[in-house]
Amino acid sequence: MKIINIGILAHVDAGKTTLTESLLYSSGAIKELGSVDSGTTKTDTMFLERQRGITIQTAITSFQRENVKVNIVDTPGHMDFLADVYRSLSVLDGAILLISAKDGVQSQTRILFHALRKMNIPIIFFINKIDQNGINLPDVYQDIKDKLSDDIIIKQTVNLNLKPYVIDYTEPEQWETVIVGNDYLLEKYTIGKTLNIAELEKEENERIQSCSLYPVYHGSAKNNIGIKQLIEVITSKLFSPTQLNSDKLCGNVFKVEYSDDGQRLVYVRLYSGTLHLRDSVNISEKEKIKVTEMYTSINGELRQIDKAEPGEIIILKNELLKLNNVLGDKKRLPHREILENPLPMLQTTIEPCKSVQREKLLDALFEISDSDPLLQYYVDTVTHEIVLSFLGEVQMEVTCTLIQEKYHIEIETRKPTVIYMERPLKKSEFTIDIEVPPNPFWASIGLSVTPLPLGSGIQYESLVSLGYLNQSFQNAVMEGIRYGCEQGLYGWKLTDCKICFKYGLYYSPVSTPADFRMLAPIVLEQAFRKSGTELLEPYLSFEIYVPQEYLSRAYNDASKYCANILNTKLKGNEVILIGEIPARCIQEYRNSLTFFTNGRSVCLTELKGYQVTNIKSAFQPRRPNNRIDKVRHMFNKINLH
């Protein structure tokens, strides 16, 4: 059986979930249509999704037409969840990009198209809601050409009367897009030779698969118009890259979620080989798992299966598998660019209103962060506060609401802050000697710190031989340095430097590893006080599209939001501004652009990394440590004079 995995992507309220329901209904997978308004759809599984009316997690469902099975990965529909969209995109054989006939191409449509094109995923445009009043399809076509791609082919004629309908007929002039992309067809066409439909369709299909041509279809998901035609094109024009002739297993974990009863569900896309129940499968060179339960979606229902073929999406109940784990042979994964998940850029503290629910809150955060790599948390070992880090404020809002609605925990949070980092300004060294006041520890340590280029991270080297200082003491120094790097002079994590352990001395038998572990962060702090540190903050690279008449305003406003414009380009009636901006400023700049362009701007961003900030006073309260703080303060007092 042929298996196709598709995604349905759209801006909010374009009708994505309704289209999924309509595909299931028209194919016979379900007997009645669900409704987003009433919360009865197949794919919006979480209570929170039903309440908000937008899809937040990724659900899997399927339908079958003749000998073709189509798995639908219903991707998230909110900007703060694009990282989840990227993860889902990696398993797709094709995508339906939904465009509202009334609203046309929206900002998020362009962002999604950009991601799909970057990952070389074939795209079918579906113009939805053609049964609404005031529809002008030629304007929508032009909107697609201006904002997405000229390489489209209109595959239907549409009658917009009181009861709209579509006819599968491609106007002759539409084939010109196909002809001009093929030298052989263009030559035949130029000299007046007849082109038969078979060779045109062959070229069309090849270009769709190579992501250089985008067919356009029409309909109304709500009223089931044009859906059967869409099913036909999905099953006939999209193909899976699975290696049907390979007996070597290869599958990739792209999603983790928890059921209402706490079972951990792992979603796997199989690319080659066959997986059987009770198989033992490699997930690394030294680790295997045994498949004890295996499920897949069959006609909209989750069913247990004994065997899974290449191309299938399966669900395993497993505690070991993590996101992006590969089952079997990694070499058989298709070569497709994986867009990197951005790092969390904001943080806050989160506590339950009732202290008795603290353990329950930690359990909830474990499940949520296990499913979403953009959400991280830790318990401060000194203050015992729960610190939550995340990508955007909507993500925080959804997480907090989820904790309240699914886990029934009332919580309190502080105002989010940007996650800064620190880097030394210059090379420095510092040594604290044994038995030299105020050092109370039976240890001597000498460290040097050297700044490294941005993005280098922390590097560590020990110049003290193991013959002179044994491994347990060396390990203790490393542990102390690791702890010391958690808090710089401003209270933020240190990065982009090399730390060298240059000197160590112990007294036998009184010295212990604990002496070195306690002293190392104090020496490190003094070295950083000599070098000084500079604050770094997360930066984004951006491409901003604005109509030409707003260029001056967009350009002049850049400095107000600390944006640095590096280049400009003209594209049709738009100007593209290319540059970089602090992550803390992007939302305000984006909101401003949206306001003064009346929603006609688009802002594409990717995490660039940490850059030097012009913020001078971004202090984070230092976490106390009763075992070393008194000594720290004494050394700080001495070195001030």
Swiss-Prot record:
Protein family according to the UniProt entry: Belongs to the TRAFAC class translation factor GTPase superfamily. Classic translation factor GTPase family. TetM/TetO subfamily.
Origin superkingdom: Bacteria
tr-type G domain mapped to chain residues: 1-242
Keyword GTP-binding: yes
Alphabetized NCBIfam families for the sequence: small_GTP (TIGR00231), tet_protect (NF012153), tet_protect_M_W (NF033148)
UniProt cross-references to PROSITE patterns, sorted A to Z: G_TR_1, G_TR_2
Alphabetical list of Pfam families matching this protein: EF-G_D2, EFG_C, EFG_III, EFG_IV, GTP_EFTU
Bilayer-spanning residue ranges: none
Name of the protein: Tetracycline resistance protein TetS
Residues noted as binding GTP in the record, renumbered to the chain: 10-17, 74-78, 128-131
Alphabetic keyword roster: Antibiotic resistance, GTP-binding, Nucleotide-binding, Plasmid, Protein biosynthesis
Gene Ontology molecular function: GTP binding; GTPase activity
GO biological process: response to antibiotic; ribosome disassembly; translation
Function: Abolishes the inhibitory effect of tetracyclin on protein synthesis by a non-covalent modification of the ribosomes.
CDD domains (UniProt xref): Tet_C, Tet_II, Tet_III, Tet_like_IV, TetM_like
UniProt-listed Gene3D superfamilies: 3.30.230.10, 3.30.70.240, Elongation Factor G (Translational Gtpase), domain 3, P-loop containing nucleotide triphosphate hydrolases, Translation factors
